[in-house]
């Protein structure tokens, strides 16, 4: 229960900095985002043998992501998209040259939500049983923790890699107004959908040889048109 609530506050800690009007957010998208965050928290919790530090670090990392999103939106009125990750060094150099970093009240509110999430994670670690009497019981608990962690972390990995967010879930990032998509659908679902669209699926009848032949055909036709001119 503590981790379920921690997932809610971690989500708020990430989103509220830049997306504080939840009246137009799609409920199912936010529910999906909460499920992803909470499952990751549970997986880390059991991976580190029921200690709350790991999910607390995740909550803080999401807060940092939300603050970065706030600054990027303030700077260029666009969200952080998958393609931006290849230009982090350039963005940091530009931002460090005369750019004034000032936070808003919503950033402070996000900080409060993140603090609550981290406290809930630590409390979950305090109330959870850590040791069992006897070597057999201790080994059983260790294996159980690792199994739950693998199921949670592996489940999230399989979910974001195997499920087509665009065609199956209908989560669309509009090219001309991506910020609206991120605000309406939640940062993580929109980011995952955008990342999946970078590499489009290969058509069933696609052939490299046919593609090369088509290119040569068009190149030859273009060369002939130049000769006639």
Where are these regions (language model features)?
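Transmembrane and membrane-interface helices of multi-pass
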Residues: 1-176
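Short low-polarity hydrophobic stretches
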Residues: 23, 224-225
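Membrane-interface segments at or immediately adjacent to transmembrane helices
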Residues: 155-223
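Conserved small/polar residues in nucleotide/adenosyl-binding loops
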Residues: 227-229
């Amino acid at each position: 229960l503590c981790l379920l609530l921690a997932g809610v506050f971690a989500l708020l800690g990430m989103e509220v900095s830049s997306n504080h009007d939840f009246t137009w957010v799609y409920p199912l998208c936010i529910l999906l985002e909460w499920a992803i965050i909470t499952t990751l928290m549970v997986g880390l919790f059991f991976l580190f043998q029921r200690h709350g530090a790991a999910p607390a670090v995740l909550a803080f990392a999401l807060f940092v992501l939300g603050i970065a999103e706030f600054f990027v939106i303030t700077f260029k009125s666009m969200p952080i998209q998958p393609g931006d990750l290849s230009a982090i060094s350039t963005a940091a150099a530009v931002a460090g040259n005369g750019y004034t970093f000032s936070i808003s009240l919503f950033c402070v509110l996000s900080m409060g939500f993140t603090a609550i999430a981290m406290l809930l994670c630590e409390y979950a670690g305090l109330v959870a049983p850590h040791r069992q009497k006897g070597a057999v019981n201790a080994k059983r608990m260790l294996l159980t923790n690792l199994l739950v962690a693998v199921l949670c972390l592996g489940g999230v990995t399989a979910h974001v890699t195997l499920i087509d967010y665009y065609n199956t879930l209908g989560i669309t990032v509009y090219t001309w107004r991506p910020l609206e998509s991120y605000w309406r659908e939640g940062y993580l679902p929109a980011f995952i959908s955008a990342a999946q669209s970078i590499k489009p699926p290969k058509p069933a009848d696609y052939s490299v040889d046919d593609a090369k032949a088509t290119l040569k055909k068009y190149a030859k036709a273009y060369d002939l048109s130049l000769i006639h001119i």
